[in-house]
């Protein structure tokens, strides 16, 4: 049997005179052995060409026929060049993995550990390489080494979390995630302990001033993330997550460099979210839906995983409370990346809670019993209270954003902005007579102007335009934290001044990406008086592609650019200080100038609103799972104000239902509300709210009475209370507005997929049927509580007849019965409600 060994070649060993035949073959005269008639890069220095001359063509063919084909190791003479190259790459990867695993052993320094993890990230970058490692049985060795790491270094933690994610979610055994070691490792990633003995370089005056504002650990963490090895790990981790389409498809964000998602907690939560997904199997023969899969959710609860996720939600809630407390946020109070990362972590935690409570009564009970103290306060907050508080905060932020989009307010003058602690951007564009001066974004605060002046470098570079600092009297700027600076804190918390991201062509934008810094540097180097505009001064993609520059040099240059930029931005974000992850905006072809007149338009950041909407929808789904067939959960949610909160969500986010006319006007055709087409996000949100209300009133008479008597205040576009809306007319309005034409339409009518109008109409009808069914079920449950409530509902229905609900409820029950998704006791209750609706 031929046995091929692989050895790492050193430079200068291509022509070495080694006994290759003895190294590869036990004996050159063995009948089992044969030379291979191809030449590759690997074989150019391995195969002994002198031994090939001892064989003739006849001998070679004779030995080839005698050789048994048992599929053993090595290559036969019929191996192709591609197969040989692939085999060489496999062996090379195996060798690289072994070297990297040696670097992960205990006792090595942090820099060695980082280098080893960076090497493993590069090896596991593509799915093909990961499959090859799994085929060789090496992936399990990598996972075992990662589970035994000491999590005392932030970059190493990020690399370990990324490797664990990509190796466990890419075809790994499902039951592997249920092991205690895996779950404990994920919990440790959510609660990392950074060693205080980590040695860092002496900090400069800027870092020392920064430590006054923040804690010493934050400054040390920032220093640990700003070296070349950390940047290399961040780049490789981001590339893997982008290739897995996690950054783009899950959070609906553009691919950016140094995104806030690139944190250890976010990746660990991502792994938990994937593992908590319950697998649903559909039986083709019976048409039933059943749950299948492992027990990761239960193991996660038993080993403290849900408690750790609850702690992360508490931290995010603390940050969100500060958004409500501060009408206008100063740069020292809340940093940009902290807000962005808080929402992203919150979304992942809510996804985990949603998946963990789905079809798991034990997890529902465990979360309902959870309560933690609120920091230094003596009061304790239960999980239900926490979720309702999160829903209220998110709803308020989203509603203010929409109001500011429709009714923007003028931006305040710079003097008032500085007085209120706004973030101010001073640009040399308006203070210099030269049109090519570079833009330097400087953060100014009221309390730390002296620290700002110390941290800024005002020495101009030779042959370049310097950034000019002027007073308010010389330069009239109109930038605020809520609109033009691009600050996430201003976009979310200072919603009274408008939510905006730095996308408007008429506003000043903070330059935070390395691409912009590189453009300025290239212009300063060229100094061509006939050069084009700044955005065209950078090298083209073809020019960059032709430059033969190593990855290390590229990362080094990028690191230096980012370091120069940080020196001009003393008050960086929380993520930059703790993790060094510099969130950068994807550059686009637009002008960046400061307007001399106040801007009256606001460009609402769609990405931020989408993130808020996702968090709000998922939080409602968590409560819906907690109350699904759980009487304790229904009592807890109702006791914490869940009924009133859901009613406020309907009124606030769907104001059109409060303005719907009476049913007589709907029948006459004067109402245009039926033509409204809900978006997928709005439809899911409305259905989740109605589903939660159905769970709350299904088996609880007290909740039925409270919901029927509820009255929700209606606010005007300025945010002031205008009137009140009773719940019964509101629910009847939802039902009548979404009542489809399924009862009158000929079911035998068909349409083709080419008919676009027919397809869209069918889609609208399907959406209406879903909302119609849940609203009808909710009205039917309320009608069974008392005669007065039943009469109140009849007053808002056509012909004062409750029988209009019966066909809708029959279709609802038939659908869920077909899929076997309705419990027997629930089916019995619904059938009794349907019979009651048939009574006069």
Swiss-Prot record:
Keyword Cell cycle assigned: yes
What the record says about disrupting the gene is: Plants missing both WAPL1 and WAPL2 have relatively normal growth (slightly slower) and development but exhibit a significant reduction in male and female fertility (aborted pollen and ovules prior to fertilization and embryo defects in fertilized seed), due to blocked removal of cohesin from chromosomes during meiotic prophase (late zygotene/pachytene stage) resulting in chromosome bridges, broken chromosomes and uneven chromosome segregation, and leading to shorter siliques containing fewer seeds; this double mutant restores pollen viablitity to pollen-lethal ctf7 mutation.
Gene name per UniProt: WAPL2
- Extent of Basic and acidic residues compositional bias: 558-567
Q: Where is the WAPL domain?
A: 764-819
Broad class of the protein's primary localization:
nucleus
Q: Which organism is it from?
A: Arabidopsis thaliana
Enumerate composition-biased segments (Polar residues): 569-585
Q: Which GO terms describe its cellular component?
A: chromosome; nucleus
Query: By what name is this protein known?
Result: Wings apart-like protein 2
The function of this protein is:
Regulator of sister chromatid cohesion in meiosis which negatively regulates cohesin association with chromatin, acting as an antagonist of CTF7. Cohesion ensures that chromosome partitioning is accurate in both meiotic and mitotic cells and plays an important role in DNA repair. Essential for the prophase removal of cohesin during meiosis thus determining the timely release of meiotic cohesion. Important for proper spindle attachment and assembly during meiosis. Helps to prevent abnormal centromere association during prophase I in meiocytes. Required for early embryonic patterning.
Under the subunit heading, UniProt states: Interacts with the cohesin complex throughout the cell cycle.
Keyword terms of this UniProt record: Cell cycle, Cell division, Chromosome, Chromosome partition, Meiosis, Mitosis, Nucleus
Question: Can you cite a GO biological process for this protein?
Answer: meiotic sister chromatid cohesion
According to its UniProt record, in which tissues is this protein expressed? Expressed in roots, leaves, buds and siliques.
